Structure formats: C-alpha cells, structure tokens
Amino acid sequence: MGGCEVREFLLQFGFFLPLLTAWPGDCSHVSNNQVVLLDTTTVLGELGWKTYPLNGWDAITEMDEHNRPIHTYQVCNVMEPNQNNWLRTNWISRDAAQKIYVEMKFTLRDCNSIPWVLGTCKETFNLFYMESDESHGIKFKPNQYTKIDTIAADESFTQMDLGDRILKLNTEIREVGPIERKGFYLAFQDIGACIALVSVRVFYKKCPFTVRNLAMFPDTIPRVDSSSLVEVRGSCVKSAEERDTPKLYCGADGDWLVPLGRCICSTGYEEIEGSCHACRPGFYKAFAGNTKCSKCPPHSLTYMEATSVCQCEKGYFRAEKDPPSMACTRPPSAPRNVVFNINETALILEWSPPSDTGGRKDLTYSVICKKCGLDTSQCEDCGGGLRFIPRHTGLINNSVIVLDFVSHVNYTFEIEAMNGVSELSFSPKPFTAITVTTDQDAPSLIGVVRKDWASQNSIALSWQAPAFSNGAILDYEIKYYEKEHEQLTYSSTRSKAPSVIITGLKPATKYVFHIRVRTATGYSGYSQKFEFETGDETSDMAAEQGQILVIATAAVGGFTLLVILTLFFLITGRCQWYIKAKMKSEEKRRNHLQNGHLRFPGIKTYIDPDTYEDPSLAVHEFAKEIDPSRIRIERVIGAGEFGEVCSGRLKTPGKREIPVAIKTLKGGHMDRQRRDFLREASIMGQFDHPNIIRLEGVVTKRSFPAIGVEAFCPSFLRAGFLNSIQAPHPVPGGGSLPPRIPAGRPVMIVVEYMENGSLDSFLRKHDGHFTVIQLVGMLRGIASGMKYLSDMGYVHRDLAARNILVNSNLVCKVSDFGLSRVLEDDPEAAYTTTGGKIPIRWTAPEAIAYRKFSSASDAWSYGIVMWEVMSYGERPYWEMSNQDVILSIEEGYRLPAPMGCPASLHQLMLHCWQKERNHRPKFTDIVSFLDKLIRNPSALHTLVEDILVMPESPGEVPEYPLFVTVGDWLDSIKMGQYKNNFVAAGFTTFDLISRMSIDDIRRIGVILIGHQRRIVSSIQTLRLHMMHIQEKGFHV
C-alpha cells in the first residue's frame, strides 16, 4: 500500500482497531523536481489543525520505533445522519508556486461492513481550499472555501480485513491553480464516512538546476498551462564559450525538454566530466571545442597550463600559416653536388637536394649570379642580362637553364635552398657556389643596334660586328616581337650581313629586337634588347611631300630652257609615277606577306553567310561545285541535323579516288532548313586548316546525270529525294533528258572522310588504350583548330567531343558548324542567340544565363572537351539533370579530375572554367601550353591523386578554414549527418578525403544529388588547398 502501512486503527464504538506504532515516517519519496510546502510525516510537534465542530475529527498521535511522531486525523460518525465535520490546515505559504499539488493518504471503511448504518454511512469526503495573504487564526467560514474535488477511495476495508490485520491505504493527488495570493488553507469535509487521514503532503513542481552540454540552467517554475513550455537560456560553465546559444525548455511536470545549442571548452581547456579543465604543461589545445588537449608537436614545448599554442625550441620556427598541430621546423641546409652542362646557347645547372630539409616539404631554390674577373674576390651582380628558365627564384625543381650569357666571362652561381621558415631565421642562408667560364671559342656579343629608317610596316636595322668572332661569321639571327606581347610569341629571321630590313610589321607599334651571331664554333649570346617603333601613315605622307618638294625645286632650276624644262618635267613625272607605283606594289606585298605567312591587318577574314540575301550566292562564293558523276555513294554511316550522312568515293581530275562523307538534305524540308544547310556549307568553305574538317565541295546544279538509283543512300531516296527530281521528259527525235533537280535546292555537301568517327564514341570504344601524351596530342590538335577559328573572329558555340572527328592517324578535326556564329573584331564582342537549344553541359555560365557567346565561352567548352578526352568519353556531370548542373556551377562546383589525369591538365581545365570569362585562357595560350607539355613529358607524370603533400609556398595558398576533425569539416558545410558514413568507410583523415571521387561519395551512402554536389565541391577546394599552385593565373 504505497510502501507505507498503517497497521492498526483505533476503533471508536467498535469500528477501529488500535493503530500500530510501526509506521515508517520517511516512506514518501520526494523527487528532485518537487518543492514540498507541507508534509505531515515530517512534523515533529503537534499539527494544531482546527476542527469544526470540536467533536468531529479526532487527532491521534503515536510514536514509531524511531521515536518519531505519526500524526493522524480520523472520523467515523456514521451512526448519525447529516454529518458536516471540517478539518482545516494551518496557513501554508505558496513560495514561488503557481500551481500546487495535494497528496493525501487515507483509509476508508466499507459501509456494507458496518451494521445498521446503510442510510447514514458515506464512502467519500470533500477537499476545499482558500487563498489568503496572511493567517486568519481561528476564524473559519466554510462558505469562503472553494471545493477542489470529492475524494473517493480506490479500496475500502472491512471487518474481515481488520481481523486479518490487512490495511488498505489509498493515495490521491489533486492539483490546484493558479495560486495568486501569498498563501492558502486546505480543508477536509466529512459528510458521514468512516475515514482516517494518515498523511497530507503539499508541493509544487520545478525544473531543477541542471548542466547540459557545458551550459548551466537555473531552477525554473513551469507555467500553469500544461501545454506551454518555458524557454530558458543557459550560461556556459567556467572556461567555456558558446558555440550556439544553449537553450532548454521547462515542461509542466518539471522536466527539461528539447535541448538546443551548446557550449564548448575554450582554447587551452578540455572537457572532463561536464566541466572544462586547463591543459596540463606539455599539452595544448589551439581551438575552442570539446576535444581533448594534445601533446605538443615535435620541437616545441610549454611549461604553463591552459596553453593554446606550444612555443618552438631555439633554432626552430613555425610559419605564419602553419597549423599549431604541425611540428616546428628549421631552414634547410645548402644544396649539394652542383654540376653544370654548357653548350653554344645554354648553360644548365643541376644540384641535389639539401641533406637536411628542416622537416618541411615546401622546399624552393634561388640562384644568384655574379660576374667575376680574373680576381674572383672582385665580383659584381650579373644584372638583367641573363635569362633564367623558368626563373632564378622560387624554383621547385633542382635545375635551371641560363640563356644569353656572354663568352669570355667567369660566372659564379650561388644556389640557395629555402623553405617556409627561412625568412624567420636571422642566420645567413647557406648556399653552394660554382664558377663557370663560358666558351672562349664562341663569338662575343654584337655591338650597338641602330635603326636606319622605319616605315609604316618596315624597319631597317644595322649593328656592329662582334669584337671576337673566332672565325668567319656565317650569319646573324634576329629575334623580334611586339613589346606588348613580350614572352607570348616571337618571330625570327636571318641575315648574312650586319643589317636587315624587317617587313610585315604593324604601324605605330613598338618592337623589341635581340640579335646574335653564328660562327663555325657556335652561337654567341643574344644581345641586350633594343626597342624601335614603326612609323604611322602621317609620317609616310610627309616623306612623299618632301619628295615632291625636291622635284619641284629641281624643276624651277631649269627654267632657262623651256624645251629642256618640259622634257625634264615629263621625264621626272614618269619616273615619279614609276617609283611610287613600285613602292606601293612593294608595300602591298609587304603588307600581305610576313615571314612566309599571309596577313590581312584590319580585315575580317570570315564572312557571315547571313549577309547574303540569297544563300545560294554564298555557297557559290565559298564552296566548289562538284559534278555528281564524280561521286560514288556506298553506305549510310549516320544521321545529321538535315538528313542522313553517307560514305563514298570522290574522283578528282588527274588524281586517284579519295574517301569522302556526304551530308544530305532530307525530303520535305522547310525553307529554314534549306537556308541552314546552305549556311553550313558556306561556313565550312571558308576554312582551311589541318584541324578543321575540310569541305571538298557541294552538289547544287540543276541537271543531274542518269545514274543508278542504287548508287544513292537508300533511305535518302525513301525520304523524298526522288520526289524532288523531275521525271525524264521526251525530246524531239526521240530519247529523253536526264532527271532534273528543282532550281536552287541543295542536294549534297561533300567533306573529307574521317575513319574513326566522333571522338566521344571513339574514346569509349578504346577506353584506356592510349598514353597520356597521345591524348595530349589530340587535345593539341583540337586547340589548334579552335585557335584558327578564334583568330578569324569566329565562335563555334557547340564545341564538344561528339563534334570532333578522328581520322585513321588520330588527327582530331573540329566539325559541325550548325550553331556557329561570326564574332566582330571587338575583342570583347559576344554573339547573342535568338533562340534554339543550348548544350548546357558544355556551355559557359554567361552563355546559359544571357545567351551571349564569345571565344571565351568556346574556351569553357574546350575545358569540358579536355575532361571528356581524359575520362575516355564519360558524360560530363554524369546523371545530374541540366538544372542541377546550372546550380552546381553557380555554387562554384567544377568537374573533378578524371582518374589518372595529370595535374597540369586539370589545372588548365580549371582555368578554362573560370567564372569571369576575361580570366579564361586564349586558344593561343592553350596551344602554347600544350606544346610545352609535349616537349617536356615529365610534366605529365604528376597526377592529381598524387598531389597530397603540404603546399610548398604557404604565402600563395588560398585561404581555407582549418579543421581539426573530419566531423568539424562536415559540420562546416552542413553535412554533419554523414559523419558516421565517413567513419564507417574509413575516411577519417583529410589526406584520404582529398582522394575521394563522386563514386566514393555515392558508395558511402550519400544518395541526394545536392548533397553529393556540396561534398564534392568542398573536396575540390580542400584538394586545391593541399596543392601548391606556384603562381596565380594562367601562364604558358
């Protein structure tokens, strides 16, 4: 019976047994969320409750075995009717309570077990209360009390229970509220029951003080309304700080609910059993969080508590961007084993890495050059006369090439090794020196270069022969380039004499010239650079005016003889006309010919067929008409935009048959399709480049030979070709003319045949069969073709592997000009489409958003083609929808490197995918970059998946948040729900995560595409952070 038993009751008039004194006074368990206002079991003295009338309720007090009082009130006036006996408590202070709970323990006699009381005995009693701000003393007015409830017993006892010494104790709890005054009274009304009130406990509930997630929450009283919660903001424990605002909600039953936010231990402190403790000496914690303190990394120490960073030992340093978890390092020792190799034009220095790298991987080298005379103690800086390839500072590889050195000179090269902490050390940088004496047999440098004259497109130069030629001079090499395009591209020519006339230059443009001499012993070094500027149109006109003035003056001098004067003017005028005509002819030739290449300055070399009112005029202007009898069609090889594509043979006059592909226009075509078909032929006819598909010609003539139907593409005939040919008609004298084609209707476009078809299908068919250098060769061919188009001011708009054709020699050629448009001379110009489908996966963001195309958008597409080639024809962005692709690119996501892709190629892809189109590389730069890779295949050996070392130049690494754990990284990108997936799959370090591909992300259970995209994008950023990008921007 609730764990507390009343053994006996004292019977009045024979109804109760005496109460046993074995009543346990501390039987009630009080929860820590209850505040007790009254508990009769703990009162040591008399309760002093008031009874009305006096002979109603009786107070009985007994002592238990611990000599503690047991206070009981009982009443059993069941023999008399109309009972109204009241028992009132003393005044009870409500404290902070808004709602109180009354717990009553009592026994009640079954009326049926008492004889002769059926009309007067009751089995319930009533509970009342009254609020007041102070005690009323003995005054009692029942009508001032409010009824709480009628209390009935769950179990009642009988005479038999008394005989068997069985006590049935009832426990009832009632709640009262809201309580607004300072206190209250309770009253119990008996209306004729036989009852013993064993104990009364009055309490209210609270949410007790607690500590959750390192945040303290005070005692909180819940609201009266059980459906509402009280929001409580916590305060962090000592040495902790908020990560997110800590909150708890207090429920009506005194329970804390819905924990939100948390506190974390500050730097230098760790969590131990719900509080933050300072890190011990020799340990540190660099970041606020609930991780443990870590032992100081090698070569660092601390003697204090609560340390956030360990101090480096003497002679060791920590770079600015080194994480606190990284060991302290020191500068490297000097490089070793310096050797050199010299020829007529270049000096190659090589060395071994230092024996002590200082514990770092960001090792770089610098080469300092000094020129020394016979006395090596007197040296001077080499100045800017020498060129170092790739540079003389910040070298990553342990070699450098020196150019433009002078013969007969002693050069001393000091090679220094440095790392990320070298600048923090005050000790002199160790170096290894080597002295090289240049070839005494090679010729010395030439003398000063002079400009003899300059015209609008030409410059005449002369110079002094070298002081020491050491043999007969064979010739001079002159290298020159536009000053504004320095180091991008250059031209060269040769001269037998110490003078030259350079033609084909741009007007009013500064050029830089370098000259060296060649003898039987080899080349000299290049001279210092000399700058000269071509003339403009105004200067040429002034020269002509000067010539006229001289002629006129000479004419006036012969005024004495009229006949002689007349003859003089006639002869002079004729010579003048002849000279001018010759000069203009020569100038025209120079304008069109420069070092063997035709140039047309200021003239747009591509003509848009849309400028022709009749598209057939453009076709005849740019495409060669082919006699249909020379074409033999063999089979269908595919379907194009306008019809089917067949393979066949073309017989050329005086030559053997060549394989060709024939594009046809399907029957029942619309006028717009006919115009577009003509337009593509007109476009292709203007191109002549080994990496652009070659147009052999078109068939558009009205008359058609009587050739067998089986010679044509069968489905081409079924599509309506025969219906477009007029039937043969009779002629006088018998016979008939051959069938005719309606006027102006295009029939066929004939192009060169590419045996291996489209590049994407070809790569998928030969997955993994090619070397990296072969793939780079394919990419170089595509870039060369696109450079040709870009130089003509032409935008392709649909560059993709499916539109690249491959011949039997693996030569790749750009094709499919259906979407192409002309680009104006303005370098910032872009073409705006008027509609039509855009290939989203290959198209630059600005072209998708604003339908603006430029050579820069073609560069973006070229980056996608690179990815297709290196992945052997995989679909870009895999199964992502077009909308997901657009959103991903806007969020900064870029395709990861395909498996086995060299880092240099993926870096080029990323440059092509720059969001700002002006930052993307030009096709000229791309071709030059790929040429360098082909000439230096070792640059292709480093794969993206191999680049897992720390950056070699911390100052050049982009900013990136530093995370201690993989979980922190996932939380930062709001992907914390996948922590267990990463741990279960073994991806517990950033080294492993940086290697993950999209397939790995799917494999560990990331199903949602949006989540895959966010994680892969962050991994790309992480991987770039771990890579060393030697210089910002794109360089060739």
Swiss-Prot record:
The chain residues annotated with the modification Phosphotyrosine are Y606, Y612, Y831, Y978
Please indicate the ranges of residues that lie on the Cytoplasmic side.
572-1036
| Motif PDZ-binding, residue range(s) on this chain | 1034-1036
Please list the residue ranges annotated as the Protein kinase domain: 631-944
What is an example of a Pfam family matching this protein? Answer: SAM_1
**Residue sites binding ATP per the record:** I637, G638, A639, G640, E641, F642, G643, E644, V645, K663
Q: Where do the catalytic residues lie? A: D798 (proton acceptor)
Record bears the keyword Calcium: no
Q: What is the designated name of this protein?
A: Ephrin type-A receptor 6
From which source organism is this entry? Homo sapiens (Human)
